[in-house]
């Protein structure tokens, strides 16, 4: 398996690359690209870790050499949030970066599974889809917005609040990947019950967890280490699916059946073509249904912004 990380010199990219070097299947190839000249050095640094994963680093304007033959591409390139910024402030810079990188993916590895980490994910995934459509290589089963960070945060916070074994907690998080569009389905968690106040507070904490990190880092960055872990979990799940492993399920922001919006985060079964099946997320509580109804206009507007950017 060949995995390419685009944006590999950044905070998320380096954390993700370190985790993948340690956790990819033996015999895999890890291809690192960033515009920054330090990137080949990041690859050399990682190459000293004794695992059977070969690492190569590429820098400069053109990511194509890093992409040829890639099975999975994870894109974390772009600028990070700073205090006072929301994810939409990132759009002006990151939209162009994602567009350019996905154009190169379309040319160099059109069959690869592409996971978009770069925020605002609600919009950057729509940009990626439009770029792939223009190139004539769009396959909705092969494009993902990586929302796993919302899932691992939900699992962590719920386990802490309820004194549960975090390894056993599973939380589906649906909708999108910013603010009110993040909807953790707390009503469905096995072995945990919440009061109405707890649901409201926990939902808000999960939605605002990114801001919690940005503020705690006091201008020194955003969530890089936890995002690296989340992206690694999702990337490894993509690979398990490609290798034919059964019952690999994750939540991700994908083009599903369009019931709510063109793109929607929901549980999916992964397989040899990426998304094998979009799974039903089950029955919503009254609180969750109200939150869903309240977020859809925001989500649809985020998606439309991406579509119009490429047009």
UniProtKB/Swiss-Prot annotation:
- Family matches, as Pfam families: Ldh_1_C, Ldh_1_N
| Top-level taxon of the source organism | Bacteria
Question: In the record, what terms sit under GO molecular function?
Answer: L-malate dehydrogenase (NAD+) activity
The answer to whether keyword NAD applies is: yes
Statement: the UniProt record of this protein carries the keyword Oxidoreductase: yes
Q: Name one GO cellular component term.
A: cytoplasm
Q: Which InterPro entries match?
A: L-lactate/malate_DH, Lactate/malate_DH_C, Lactate/malate_DH_N, Lactate_DH/Glyco_Ohase_4_C, Malate_DH_AS, Malate_DH_type1, Malate_DH_type1_bac, NAD(P)-bd_dom_sf
Question: What Enzyme Commission number(s) does the record list for this chain?
Answer: 1.1.1.37
Which keywords label this protein? Answer: NAD, Oxidoreductase, Tricarboxylic acid cycle
Where on this chain does substrate bind? 81, 87, 119, 153
Question: Which Cys-Cys disulfides exist here?
Answer: none
Which biological processes are named by the entry's GO terms? malate metabolic process; tricarboxylic acid cycle
Active site, UniProt feature: 177
Which reaction is this enzyme known to catalyze?
(S)-malate + NAD(+) = oxaloacetate + NADH + H(+)
Q: Binding positions for NAD(+)?
A: 7-13, 34, 94, 117-119, 227
Give the similarity note: Belongs to the LDH/MDH superfamily. MDH type 1 family.
Q: Tell me, how does this one assemble?
A: Homodimer.
Q: What is its biological role?
A: Catalyzes the reversible oxidation of malate to oxaloacetate.
Query: What is the designated name of this protein?
Result: Malate dehydrogenase
According to its UniProt entry, this protein's organism is Aeromonas hydrophila subsp. hydrophila (strain ATCC 7966 / DSM 30187 / BCRC 13018 / CCUG 14551 / JCM 1027 / KCTC 2358 / NCIMB 9240 / NCTC 8049)
Name of the coding gene: mdh
């Amino acid at each position: 398996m060949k995995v390419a990380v685009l944006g590999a010199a950044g905070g998320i990219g380096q954390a993700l690359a370190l985790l993948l070097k340690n956790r990819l299947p033996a015999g895999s190839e890890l291809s690192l690209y960033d515009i920054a000249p330090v990137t080949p050095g990041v690859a050399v640094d990682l190459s000293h870790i004794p695992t059977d994963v070969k690492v190569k680093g590429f820098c400069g304007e053109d990511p194509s050499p890093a992409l040829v033959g890639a099975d999975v591409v994870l894109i974390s390139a772009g600028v990070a949030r700073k205090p006072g910024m929301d994810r939409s402030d990132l759009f002006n810079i990151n939209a162009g970066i994602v567009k350019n990188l996905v154009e190169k993916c379309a040319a160099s590895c059109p069959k690869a599974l592409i996971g978009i980490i770069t925020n605002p994910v609600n919009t950057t995934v729509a940009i990626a889809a439009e770029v792939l459509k223009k190139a004539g290589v769009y396959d909705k089963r092969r494009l993902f917005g990586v929302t796993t960070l919302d899932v691992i945060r939900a699992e962590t916070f719920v386990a802490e609040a309820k004194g549960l074994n975090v390894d056993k907690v599973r939380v589906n998080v649906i909708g999108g990947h910013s603010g009110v569009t993040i909807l953790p389905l707390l009503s469905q968690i096995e072995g945990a019950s919440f009061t109405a106040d707890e649901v409201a507070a926990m939902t808000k904490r999960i939605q605002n967890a990114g801001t919690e990190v940005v503020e705690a880092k006091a201008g020194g960055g955003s969530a890089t280490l936890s995002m690296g872990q989340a992206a690694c979990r999702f990337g490894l799940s993509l690979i398990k699916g490609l290798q034919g492993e059964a019952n690999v399920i994750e939540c991700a922001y994908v083009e599903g059946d369009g019931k709510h919006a063109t793109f929607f985060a929901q549980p999916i079964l992964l397989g040899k073509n990426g998304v094998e099946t979009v799974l039903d997320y089950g029955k919503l509580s009254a609180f969750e249904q109200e939150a869903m109804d309240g977020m859809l206009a925001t989500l649809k507007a985020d998606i439309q912004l991406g579509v119009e950017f490429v047009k």
